[in-house]
Amino acid sequence: MTSFLRLVLLGFFLIFVFAVFCTPPALAQENPYIVAYDHYLEEPGNLEIEYFSTLGTQRGGNNFHAFWAEFEYGATAWWTTEFYLDGQTTFNDSTVFTGFRWENRVRPLKGEHFINPVFYVEYENKNGADKILKEVEGHDVESDFLVSNAQARKDHIHEIELKLILSSTFKGWNFTENTLAAKNLSNSPWEFGYALGASRPLALKASAKRCTLCPQNFVAGVEMYGGLGDWHSFGLHDTSHYLAPGLAWNLPSGWTLRLSPSFGLNNNSHQFLVRWGISREINGFGSMVSRLLGGRK
């Protein structure tokens, strides 16, 4: 493991300790999606720290464990910005840091509507060994992961990713559709993809008592996501697709746990992925930092 990756992990650990001991619990109801996005943004001034992990099978090669940390901040009521750090371990190969991402989501309309649009812009600086599968785009297929880490790391990727998120909530149900367009800043064509999601709490009525295993603390859902080819060959040919049920457990302490097995839907896909995540929201993080730096409350 490189010294840079050790430093990143140490910083992530220290911030997580801060989240546990220095902040009141957050009561937000998180969805179970790993790939799809709904229209809900981070509350202004709040910071959410998240860790996600993907264990993937690899036919003809070594299985892998990909992981990433997310730092999501509510800049305003209509703008959420997020920073990612990615890495992966390929069994019988090595552990590598694969890059970073800077994501921004903007919600142009106030209030709730039948369809709530969100505009998504992300810059990715990564290498070819990245395996987090945060999205599937273009002609991404399982065989892409057969290259060794040493060889894949030589491929440096600078990419802009755009999404249009259309999300609705009706009688407790959330339905979301994400359309993706990504452009490697080298001489490569635009690539396309999609993600669909539906979710609902197991119970809509909150309990009068604080409890851990109450049905309303669990949100169940399902995602489907995959690639749609590129500018020169748009469509389903030579693309991969996945179906992923998911469950989010929102604890009264403010922690959220997620679990989502993913099943490949064709021969171009990984047969099976297991994803899980843990997150914690720090209320009033922006105000705390402002006070520490001598700013106004």
What do these predicted regions represent?
Residues R6-V8, I34:
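Short helix-onset patch at the extreme N-terminus, typifying the N->h transition
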Residues V8-V20:
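Bacterial N-terminal signal peptides
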Residues A28-K297:
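Transmembrane beta-barrel domains of Gram-negative outer membranes and organellar outer membranes
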